[in-house]
Amino acid sequence: MSIETLKERLPDYAKDLKLNLSSLANDITLSPQQLAGTFVASAIASRNADVTRAIVAEYESVLSPQALTAAKAAAAIMGLNNIYYRFVHMVEGDYAHMPARLRMNVIGRPGVEKLDFELWSLAVSAINGCGMCVESHEKVVREGGLSAEQVQTAVRVAATVHAVAATLDGAAALGDHPAAG
């Protein structure tokens, strides 16, 4: 599987997603590792097995084994953090002052440049809808030297990958298939 396979599987009403997927796959705003890791972490966070397999197949040759593991780890740890910190942010009370008491060691030692891991964490946090985490990771990557355009590119990747995953899930449930070319 590949990004081309995903595009072929999208129904005709998702033409914009096909175009966005193509343009983002060829985007040069981010480094190859940053782009590939953002795609991989976003695919995992989008919870669609076919999308995850296709995107990992597309980008595993771009990433070192350590970087591939780090992208997976960003999706995993943000799956935990985004829920916990979204709760802390949404309710009033003592929770913000209480220790989380959850292991998050990978954040301190991700196995890749911290800036790349933070960017991938930002993309996953955008998918998972944790405003507190988005703000925190955005601040770190901007202070680390990434431009607003680079941050926007990562979030565009996250949004597009998530939309592709949701559309393919919906199309499968409804029996929507692309028109025969």
Curated annotation (Swiss-Prot):
The keyword NAD does not apply. SUPFAM superfamilies: AhpD-like. The active site is at residues 130, 133. Gene3D superfamilies: AhpD-like (1.20.1290.10). InterPro entries: AhpD, AhpD-like, AhpD_core, CMD-like. This is Alkyl hydroperoxide reductase AhpD. Antioxidant protein with alkyl hydroperoxidase activity. Required for the reduction of the AhpC active site cysteine residues and for the regeneration of the AhpC enzyme activity. GO terms for biological process: cell redox homeostasis; response to oxidative stress. Disulfide bonds join 130-133. Its EC number is 1.11.1.28. The lineage of its organism: Bacteria, Pseudomonadati, Pseudomonadota, Alphaproteobacteria, Acetobacterales. GO terms for molecular function: alkyl hydroperoxide reductase activity; disulfide oxidoreductase activity; hydroperoxide reductase activity; peroxiredoxin activity. Belongs to the AhpD family. Keywords: Antioxidant, Disulfide bond, Oxidoreductase, Peroxidase, Redox-active center. HAMAP family: AhpD. It catalyses: N(6)-[(R)-dihydrolipoyl]-L-lysyl-[lipoyl-carrier protein] + a hydroperoxide = N(6)-[(R)-lipoyl]-L-lysyl-[lipoyl-carrier protein] + an alcohol + H2O. It is an enzyme of class 1 (oxidoreductase). Pfam families: CMD.
